[in-house]
């Protein structure tokens, strides 16, 4: 039976419908707003795989080309691998729902969001977040929802829920908030150096805004939902647990306080191996349970030590930042480079400058666009002492790269002031927590090293949370183990003036305004400390670009002269680039960017363009080339493609019988413009130029 609910949201109507499409899925809904429609399905297997010890949740998001009235490009003419935007949207859907499944529910679960129609003003990604929760709510899959997502913008000091594309152009905040009825679960986005207080207001504006969407899902579930599956509590072998505790607990307590990551992990691995060996005979076939108990003890001991003693794994208190070392200009041929090391996390970052030809072309549902700032994050397995087969960037690498990119994009110079394409590459060489924020710090330093005039340096920090009941501790600059064993990963990046990007993920049911406010305040303290350490190496952007970077010079020509620069079939512009080796980019306003690493070549290209677009001025001297001799005078080219007539009477002060007595084709001659008629014909005089010299 078809069931539909509607809710007014941000001045628009959102409809959630079930029972019409994909009825064999465990749960399926169509969420629509305006002309945007997303089909979201949820399916879980009936049983978990034998020996399964983790929750295998998969989220897929796909934008069908037909949703925007397009046919896919390429040879096969069908949707191919996910775009970066689709990958990022998968992560947006996944992260808020993942912590809301029962801990012991281990069945394969798949969420599929398919965009079947799209307009520019209703974000299909946001509707997909709502749809994923709604599909789970009406299904038999155990899920502790609902949740909903909203995009928050701010224009002229006024917060807006799900702003339009035009409103986002004017907004100084762009964040996505996902939340349940009582708490915020996920936050991600960027801002234009906005204060922590304003960011907190934006987040909880979003939380308040989604309440009608939660109520709509509850209504849909009451009308069309089915009974949830029973998830039996996990069976605990108390005898085995007691034996594991007797053997390993005291040693584990010492091991989790070893400061070095490698030594700590080696010690824990040794405890695990010895415990397994000691219990192999009495508890044969129980290796997974033994490892699970050891993991539980590690979790318990680390958290207890932090909450009771205020001391973390590596001996720091909750606010102390790890030791930071920085270096710039270490890659001789890179346009800018930095090595940022914080504790056992290290990022090598390079900045490269290019021209408009290097811009990334992005094909979306709404046409093609260009992107001039790119940040690519790479996480090789050696950074954590592992091996793996690599087939290109994974979802995590794309997500971390985009977070760092957003953090730095807010301080870039305007394109008119700095017309370069900028690519930042962060290669993580070591990782023990907060590698994406190390990429922000290293990226900022590499851009300053490259001479990119950014507004201000940017630093990033990852905050953590340990929460047991009403007790909690906020951790600054978390380790990888603190991320794994903690309840929150809250990354905040910004300048000394304000936040430029943030991302929060949690493993519990939500965090309160109090916790988030403390985390943001503590993050500011840490960020200012990190900015200070960065300033010890480089404070502002270098005044000059690298000698290996292209120099871009901008000139302007009249719009009716653009065709003269390009020439028939591109003949003129091709001739200039071949003669000089420069790169030339012309837009339809007459703006011309000329890029070259050779100043002399750039100057020559500018002269050639000026010659092609120059216009004769009455009374001005020109060095011309005789192109054709006639009985009545000679045609002299004063600019490429621009000729004027020197009448026989204007050849000399004396009477001239034959033009060839004075000029021959191919001669260079100094002439003066003595007039331009209504048809644009140029009158030149050799006689008026006799004795004169061209100005330098």
From Swiss-Prot:
GO-annotated biological processes = mRNA catabolic process; RNA processing
Task: Identify the residues that bind Mg(2+).
Answer: 483, 489
Q: Name one GO molecular function term.
A: 3'-5'-RNA exonuclease activity
Reactions catalysed, semicolon-separated, are: RNA(n+1) + phosphate = RNA(n) + a ribonucleoside 5'-diphosphate
First-tier enzyme category under EC: transferase
InterPro entries per the record? Answer: ExoRNase_PH_dom1, ExoRNase_PH_dom2, ExoRNase_PH_dom2_sf, KH_dom, KH_dom_type_1, KH_dom_type_1_sf, NA-bd_OB-fold, PNPase
Superkingdom, according to UniProt?
Bacteria
Recite the UniProt keywords alphabetically.
Answer: Cytoplasm, Magnesium, Metal-binding, Nucleotidyltransferase, RNA-binding, Transferase
Tell me a GO cellular component.
cytosol
Family per similarity comment:
Belongs to the polyribonucleotide nucleotidyltransferase family.
Q: What is its EC number?
A: 2.7.7.8
Q: Which Gene3D superfamilies match?
A: GHMP Kinase, N-terminal domain, K Homology domain, type 1, Nucleic acid-binding proteins
Protein name in the entry: Polyribonucleotide nucleotidyltransferase
Q: Where is the KH domain?
A: 550-609
Compartment(s)? Cytoplasm
Function description: Involved in mRNA degradation. Catalyzes the phosphorolysis of single-stranded polyribonucleotides processively in the 3'- to 5'-direction.
What organism is the protein native to? Geotalea uraniireducens (strain Rf4)
Q: Which residues form the S1 motif domain?
A: 619-687
Cofactor requirements of the protein:
Mg(2+)
